Amino acid sequence: MENLRRNIAIVCGGDSSEHDVSLRSAQGLYSFFDKEKYNVYIVDVKGTDWHVNFSDGATAAIDKNDFSFKHNGKTVFFDYAYITIHGQPGENGVMQGYFDLIHLPYSPSGV
């Protein structure tokens, strides 16, 4: 049977001094999701380095053309993004504008 769970990105990190605080916020949010209903991934953004953090310490680079990544030989596309970045690019509209351009629904509010 095909996996029908939605792929959720918790986008964290950022370029401010609050990068590590944002990572902790993302971990907290991650803990609230029902993993039987959703595939939840933490996406760490710092400068031009955007990657998914896996629980085993491995990472996978985000393709910024469509906000996807490769895992186990398959391309994973996100259905929704939660922006938990403190400071830029999460609180200045940059991430929101990017998600608008690629037509990916996100939270919090728009640009």
Residue locations for each model-derived region?
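ATP-binding N-terminal substructure of ATP-dependent carboxylate-amine bond-forming enzymes
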Residues: 1-111
